[in-house]
Amino acid sequence: MPKMKTHKGAAKRFKKTGKGKIKRRKAFKSHILTKKTPKRKRNLRKPTVMKNKAEEKRIKRLLP
């Protein structure tokens, strides 16, 4: 069986942590930022770990 290919679109958006969890960037941080509070924008800067197990499983399949 041939080697699995990495899904490049997913590889640019998600990273695997040391324990195998999926790390992602938060949405709503690219434009229309004037009405958002500084606290909200600061919290959007931090990466987060995926909580949805079904989505996490699907992403892991794209990142062998």
Swiss-Prot record:
| Keyword annotations of the record | Ribonucleoprotein, Ribosomal protein
One BP term from GO: translation
Question: Which family is this sequence assigned to?
Answer: Belongs to the bacterial ribosomal protein bL35 family.
Claim: Ribosomal protein is one of the keywords in the record: yes
Top-level taxon in the UniProt lineage? Bacteria
Q: What is this protein called?
A: Large ribosomal subunit protein bL35
* Residue ranges with Basic residues bias: 1-45
Its encoding gene is what? rpmI
What is a single molecular function from GO for this protein? structural constituent of ribosome
What the entry lists under Pfam families is as follows: Ribosomal_L35p
Name the segments for region: Disordered. Answer: 1-64
InterPro entries documented for this protein: Ribosomal_bL35 (IPR001706), Ribosomal_bL35-like (IPR021137), Ribosomal_bL35_CS (IPR018265), Ribosomal_bL35_sf (IPR037229)
